[in-house]
């Protein structure tokens, strides 16, 4: 009789879970992990920003994200944030101290004037196609009024993509 009671209890529990609408993946999909820097140690901050779960680091992916959300994806951190985590550019250790992260969001000065200027316009840059080791020459440069350019030769030439 005890065995039948246990089987019935297990069946009731499974039925309750199935009919409650609980889907474990929903709980995961609503949680985004966002690293934040605190004195060379990384901590995790939970947010409900579903669209930033994936690493986005291609020209089109980042450009589309910028246009849609008016900010870089969460896998981007500034040079100062990376430095706080222990990044040293000359060591090429970003992937070691901030796995899955790319450098982006710092001001691009446009000193050579290769990009169009306008009153009040500022430019920012983001590394593209970074996986590990030393940063490459691919950059996306975007303006405060959402002009977006790419360079594959470390700022020698630019092509407007948005």
UniProtKB/Swiss-Prot annotation:
| Gene3D superfamilies per UniProt | Microbial ribonucleases
List the Gene Ontology MF annotations in alphabetical order. Answer: RNA binding; RNA endonuclease activity
* Any single Gene Ontology cellular-component annotation: extracellular region
Q: What is its main location?
A: secreted
Q: Where in the cell is it found?
A: Secreted
What protein name is recorded for this chain? Answer: Ribonuclease
Function in brief:
This is a purine-specific ribonuclease.
Q: Which family does it belong to?
A: Belongs to the ribonuclease N1/T1 family.
Enzyme class comes to hydrolase
Which residues does the propeptide include?
A: 30-53
- Give one Pfam hit by family name: Ribonuclease
Kindly identify the residues recorded as the active site. 125, 154
For this UniProt record, give its keywords in alphabetical order, as a comma-separated list: Endonuclease, Hydrolase, Nuclease, Secreted, Signal
Enzyme nomenclature, EC number: 3.1.27.-
Instruction: Specify the signal sequence span.
Output: 1-29
